[in-house]
Amino acid sequence: MRVSDSATEMTQIVLPQHANVHGSVLGGTVMHWIDLAAAVVANRHSRRPVVTAAFDELSFLVPIQIGQLALLHARITLVDRSSMEIRVDVESEDLLTGEKRHTSTAYVTFVALDPVTHRPVAVPPLELETEAERQEHAAAIERRRRRLEHRKTQLWGASPKSRI
């Protein structure tokens, strides 16, 4: 399956109920929107139920204000046996001026599940068509290597007493 086959875009207007006391969208709300957009991509690619396994490298660069749009662009970057990494870029758009600003990028890992057993299942391979997709895929392999190394040292590394 090609990257473009599952890519999605989502638009959300920032309303007062999405905002903090400073009038900008709550970080947790943006994370929720990122998770939703990424889940659509993972579902489209795998055609299976999916669950969120990890969020990586999420930073909030500039705030999105009440009345602005949050534009989310999501695409798959890596497929492993049962897991998929999805990149989500978030922009703000000022509806009065048309100005767009990059506000954040997140990498979200999903696992595809069998609908009956709820166990991880294989997903279709990823067809890379462009040089940009190949470069993003190479970077995704490195992120995956770092995630696995981190998980190994954090969960199965030294005992908790030895870290004190």
Where do the protein language model's features map onto the residues?
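HotDog/MaoC-like acyl-thioester-processing domains
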Residues: 8, 65-69, 77-164
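Buried hydrophobic packing segments
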Residues: 30, 34, 38-42
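Hydrophobic pocket-lining residues within nucleotide cofactor-binding pockets
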Residues: 19, 55, 113
